[in-house]
Each structure stands twice: as C-alpha cells, then as structure tokens.
A protein has these predicted regions:
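Histidine-anchored nucleotide/phosphate-binding helix
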Residues: 64-84
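N-terminal regions that are enriched for targeting/export leaders
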Residues: 1-69
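A substrate-binding/cap region within the structured catalytic cores of diverse enzymes
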Residues: 95-259, 269
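Charge-rich, solvent-exposed alpha-helical interaction surfaces
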Residues: 29, 71-78, 115, 119, ...
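Flexible, charged surface loops at secondary-structure boundaries
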Residues: 31-38, 80-86, 232
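Short loop/turn segments at strand-loop or loop-helix junctions that form parts
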Residues: 36-54, 90-98, 130-137
Length: 302
C-alpha cells in the first residue's frame, strides 16, 4: 500500500491498514496464495503520449516510460520477498479505445504499443505483460473495434451525464461520486492537452470542448474497464487514478516520487535521481535535453 493513491472526501483519508480497502481484493489474493501462483494485477495504462508538445518529447515511449515500467516490475519483485511466487501486472493499454476523441493518431498508438512491448522484452521485465484492443478484435479496422467495444460493454452518454450530475451531491452513492470525480479529472486533462503553442481557440472554448469530449472518453474508458473485468476476473484491479476507501480498484503511482504519468510528462535526472515532470517544467529549469543512442530526445538532466 506504500505507493497507493487515495481520493479523500472532505479531507478525510482512510488509515492503513484499512479492512474496507482490502475487502474487495482479499479473496483474489488468497486464492492465488492457496494455489501457489503469483498474485495477478491488471492495470489500464500506457495509452500513448499526450498530443501536447509542452508536456512530452514526442509520440514514442522514452525514459519516462522505461522508468515507470521498471518501477512496476520492481514492485512485483518486492512482493517476492514476502511471497516467493511474487506478482504479475498485466498492462491493458487503452490508447486505442479513445484515441480519436483525444487527438491521438492510431498510427502513433500502434508504434507506442509496440515500443512498450519492446522495452519490456529488452529490459527483461518478466513481471509485466500487455493486452490491448487490437489483440481482442483482430481483423477489424480501428473504428469498428471501438464501436464493437461500445456496443457490447458501453452505456449511453445520457446515463453517464446523470451519474455525473448526481455525483456532485453530498449524499451521492459511491458509484455516482466516482463518475463525478472522474469527469472532473478527465476534463482537466483534456483542457491541459489542448493548451499548446499555436492553437487558436480561447481558454473558454477549450474548456467547453473538454467538458463535451470528457463524456466520450469516460464512456469508452468504462467500456474498456468492463471488458477487462470480464476477461480477467481473477486479477486484482489497479488504476492510475485515486480511488476512495473500499473501491473495486486500488489507485497506484507509476513512480515513487511523482504523481505524473509518463505519457503526460518527461523524465528529469537530478543528480542521478529520476522524477517525472512536464516538459515545459524541465525546460524552465534549463535542464539539458539528452538523446538516446538513436539520436531521439529521451530525457532531461540537471
């Protein structure tokens, strides 16, 4: 639970250890232990790089992704110290699910997914593997994949809007509060991603557009989550987003020092210690840009 991220309500955060937080997951963990198998986790993450060049270096994974993948693999390795079979994290790349809504090219998603797999192989990160929409809906074009996902696992936008509205109420259900919280978070990310040099819209126009697109992203994201739950029912469910006490998912960091995800930032080497920041923040510090062995921008160094 050290790297867990929790969403607090009115400033209150559950204490650890917390029985309510363990309850949704303990039976899956116990089952794995009784069978002598690694504890399996599933994490929707690593969708593809943000389209905002003020946040990232490009469209392909760089040191930021490598750092986070090693972090997750090391986390699994640390479990081996107390439970020898250890743990395994299945990364469910969700970029294909909503790329057309957030301005990511499908070709870039394909290249990103392939490079993530290559990194896992190259660095021998044996506690990690990946799953994506392409593996499930083979032989279809990307638009058909997304539509089939919605047809089978999606819910109407109108229903989602009602949940978000109810979630703003102090006495809302856990599910409605989660919908409202997720809507606010996704709207913020979409707003930030659209604020880049050269764009011509006003901040007010960008905010309105982000609010509309956020519903589509959440609709797709929820459908992907439902698919994953059905495909991998024995896996403990993780999330890159903060989760409230007793939720069906555990929120988790992707690095020890930062809440920024690698696809929304860059790696910054500060005297040998790596942290994740947004590109413009690294440049504001006058950090030196370091290229990889192929001459591609990779990370910043102070």
């Amino acid at each position: 639970m050290r790297f867990r991220i929790v969403s607090s309500k009115k400033g209150k955060v559950c204490s650890l250890p917390c029985e309510a937080c363990y309850q949704p997951h303990i039976s899956k963990i116990v089952t794995s232990i009784l069978q002598g198998k690694p504890v399996s986790f599933v994490l929707p993450a690593f969708p593809g790089k943000s389209p905002n060049p003020s946040k990232v270096l490009g469209t392909l994974p760089d040191m930021a992704e490598r750092y986070s993948l090693v972090f997750l693999n090391d986390l699994c390795k640390s479990i081996e110290k107390i439970y020898p079979p250890g743990a395994h994290i299945l990364i469910c790349s969700d970029g294909r699910v909503f790329s057309d809504i957030i301005g990511m090219k499908d070709a870039d998603i394909t290249a990103y997914q392939r490079e993530i797999d290559a990194i896992i192989t190259r660095l021998d990160l044996t506690n990690l593997s990946t799953f994506n929409l392409d593996q499930l809906y083979t032989g279809q074009d990307f638009d058909c994949m997304r539509q089939e996902l919605l047809d089978v696992f999606g819910q109407p936008i109108a229903l989602l809007k009602e949940k978000v509205r109810r979630g703003a109420n102090e006495y809302a259900s856990r599910e409605d509060r989660e919908a409202n919280r997720m809507y606010s978070g996704i709207t913020k990310f979409l707003f930030e991603d659209a604020l880049f040099p050269g764009q011509l819209k006003s901040r007010n126009e960008i905010q309105k557009d982000a609010k509309v697109r956020a519903y589509g992203v959440i609709q797709r994201s929820n459908a992907w989550s439902n698919l994953i739950a059905g495909q991998f029912p024995e896996h403990v469910r993780l999330s890159i987003h903060p989760q409230t006490c007793g939720d069906l998912k555990l929120g988790i960091r992707l690095s020890a020092e930062s809440r920024i995800t690698p696809w929304h930032g860059v790696a910054l080497d500060i005297g040998g210690a790596i942290t994740l920041v947004k590109r413009h923040e690294a440049e504001k510090l006058a950090a030196q840009l370091i290229n990889d062995e192929n001459g591609r921008p990779d990370y910043y160094k102070l």
